């Protein structure tokens, strides 16, 4: 009979790595966990590093475009390379892969722009735009973050998204200002809890939301949620166009 016992010498051994890379990874992990831009001191504490040590690593991470530093606030946030890596991960998700061909066909059929948005650190974030024949006179691009309150996309996330995730997004958006698509320089009074709940219940019942001439005058949109097999919100599909070119009727061709 053969002896199948594994000796200590035969056990898998941990591979050697580069410690400095792993320390830098702690800073990236801290940014991902906090889901908002962080100042040097807060980021260092979250990564369990001294501020001097964190600063040294952040210089290199910034050079690699894994993080970027806001010139005004001095806060650090994920950089362009992190965004590209994140997009690669998103593109492999079943819900995204299933929705992308539909978005492209829809843009071609209706002649309007179609955006796909996923949960991000600051809020719903555009990860893909399919452009139609009609020009879109609004500054939206991959990486644009949508307001949770003033955009159809944001309200769909409020209606169907994970509550803990939404709370983190809302906290991040509270001080984001014009970093958001849909930011209002003269904000409207927030609806009371009852009115907001009624609004979200109506969105859930319809399964679709719209915005008309808001937050950008002359631009309207219709948005639907996309779920995974377990019924969890994965992304939102939003048709956007000039108010003259888009039919925002609940029973119109786009809603259908």
Model-derived features with residue positions:
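N-terminal helix-turn-helix
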Residues: 2-92, 96
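Short, solvent-exposed recognition segments
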Residues: 3-4, 135-215
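Short, structured helix-loop boundary elements
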Residues: 17-21, 40, 75, 79, ...
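Short glycine-/small-residue motifs
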Residues: 66, 126, 235-236
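A structural signal for short hydrophobic beta-strand segments in well-ordered beta-sheet cores
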Residues: 67-69, 116-117, 226
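Amphipathic alpha-helical effector-binding/dimerization core
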Residues: 72-175
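Extended hydrophobic
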Residues: 182, 186-256
